[in-house]
Amino acid sequence: MYSDKKNILQLVALLEAHGITKVVLCPGSRNAPIVHTLSTHPGFTCYAMTDERSAGYFAIGLALNGGHPAAVCCTSGTALLNLHPAVAEAYYQNIPLVVISADRPAAWIGQMAGQTLPQPGVFQTLVKKSVNLPEIQTEEDEWYCNRLVNEALLETNHHGKGPVHINIPISEPLFQFTVESLPEVRVITRYQGLNVYDRDYNDLIERLNRYQKRMIIVGQMNLIYLFEKRHTKLLYKHFVWLTEHIGNQTVPGIPVKNFDAALYAMPEEKTGQMTPELLITYGGHVVSKRLKKYLRQHPPKEHWHVSADGEVVDLYGSLTTVIEMDPFEFLEKIAPLLDNRVPEYPRVWENYCKTIPEPEFGYSEMSAIGALIKALPESCALHLANSSVIRYAQLYQVPSTIEVCCNRGTSGIEGSLSTAVGYAAGSDKLNFIVIGDLSFFYDMNALWNINVRPNLRILLLNNGGGEIFHTLPGLDMSGTSHKYITAVHKTSAKGWAEERGFLYQRVENEEQLAEAMKTFTQPEAMEQPVLMEVFSNKNKDARILKDYYHQLKQK
């Protein structure tokens, strides 16, 4: 029988799955549940050692002899510090050593409890990875614990070998051994490049061709990649391709971009048909919360993430494989190896998303964004600020010749204007930025800048506060919290824009918007930068948006 502590069960199951079966066990009470579970399991070869200093070096010997990682497990407190010399040796000798330390719960560190000291990160730069496991209470805790253990174990042999540290807080009671078997756990594997002569490579292609419902999601990418026509034809027909405007030209063929609205409108009985069996991802951040929620609630059987750095990124909670290589090289490598069967799944998604109409909003900040996108000149740069702007822009089709930029690394409201000004300063094309009032006024010193050029045009959406907060489900602002949450204001950019040499346009209705947009989007160079300030009512904007989504549900 094994310990009932779920974080211990995850750890032991993953040690076995990753082939780490030689473990040095040191005495103690806090680590007794770990020791009992490891020593009871027939898949592990356990070695008893009393002195942690010697135990660490003994484990190094085990790892050196077999070439595979070995583990050493100790109790809490100074027992862990006694492993420090061995950890240093393993680091500088590039030996895959897994240090497992039991710990008190975080609440008792520094409270005069016995055998306690701050254990997470204690080895600092002498380990390749250090993780502190959660005590599992929820499904999210279990996913997090599983991911952390996978990350640590994968790092023992990633860009060279070396030691890692796994710290496990364990609450009392400690000695409840009531579990009969280890759980089935998700094992994350990593391929460092794909070589056609590797056996593992063949297994990957076999798994790829096993699935008929294959989806590729492309996150933010600030580049253009033109696939060869032969690869485009092969890749496009075998996968559903989803991306957003910030994915830019990094997809073979024409991707589905209105999936967020499609997911909102999708009836529950259709979700099974639309859920992928295999999900492949590359690129950076994805904006759509609906897509993340959908794939977390309806996980694929496998999720492969392809990136040059090979980091474990589990956005959808179902990651099974990390492929460390350039994503475009990966796609072109697998293209000729796809089987000849053309699945129906991509057409199912495309046909469904074609039924979602592009919105026709009344005068609002959404209609202003739509008016700009429809009037943009070819081959310009479009900068989208965060919060509502980046989301509303996704409701419209942006021509593929237009480069789309957005600060989605941290998705904050600060710096969007400064980034666009800096980009335009080094650009030879027109640069348009769409920005909300809070983002603009927060970053207004971006215009206090001698490097602002005439190729910059700013569409400022001013509805007197943070409109997006009016659309958040479950947020009740009927009381006094309204003015604090939405940052209500009565500020205009007119004086500041004119002071900084901008041509200023004020818009308060649909007719003025249409007229001002002609000047704002003219492709010819102008003598000064332009700022168009569109005023709207945030309550009305929120109502118009809710009505649009309500109509989608009625389809």
Swiss-Prot record:
Binds 1 thiamine pyrophosphate per subunit. Pathway: Quinol/quinone metabolism; 1,4-dihydroxy-2-naphthoate biosynthesis; 1,4-dihydroxy-2-naphthoate from chorismate: step 2/7; Quinol/quinone metabolism; menaquinone biosynthesis. It catalyses: isochorismate + 2-oxoglutarate + H(+) = 5-enolpyruvoyl-6-hydroxy-2-succinyl-cyclohex-3-ene-1-carboxylate + CO2. Its cofactor is Mg(2+); Mn(2+); thiamine diphosphate. The keyword Membrane does not apply. Keywords: Magnesium, Manganese, Menaquinone biosynthesis, Metal-binding, Thiamine pyrophosphate, Transferase. GO terms for molecular function: 2-succinyl-5-enolpyruvyl-6-hydroxy-3-cyclohexene-1-carboxylic-acid synthase activity; magnesium ion binding; manganese ion binding; thiamine pyrophosphate binding. Its EC number is 2.2.1.9. One of its GO terms (biological process) is menaquinone biosynthetic process. Pfam families: TPP_enzyme_C (PF02775), TPP_enzyme_M_2 (PF16582), TPP_enzyme_N (PF02776). CDD domains: TPP_PYR_MenD, TPP_SHCHC_synthase. NCBIfam families: menD (TIGR00173). Catalyzes the thiamine diphosphate-dependent decarboxylation of 2-oxoglutarate and the subsequent addition of the resulting succinic semialdehyde-thiamine pyrophosphate anion to isochorismate to yield 2-succinyl-5-enolpyruvyl-6-hydroxy-3-cyclohexene-1-carboxylate (SEPHCHC). Belongs to the TPP enzyme family. MenD subfamily. Homodimer. This is 2-succinyl-5-enolpyruvyl-6-hydroxy-3-cyclohexene-1-carboxylate synthase. It comes from Bacteroides thetaiotaomicron (strain ATCC 29148 / DSM 2079 / JCM 5827 / CCUG 10774 / NCTC 10582 / VPI-5482 / E50). The lineage of its organism: Bacteria, Pseudomonadati, Bacteroidota, Bacteroidia, Bacteroidales.
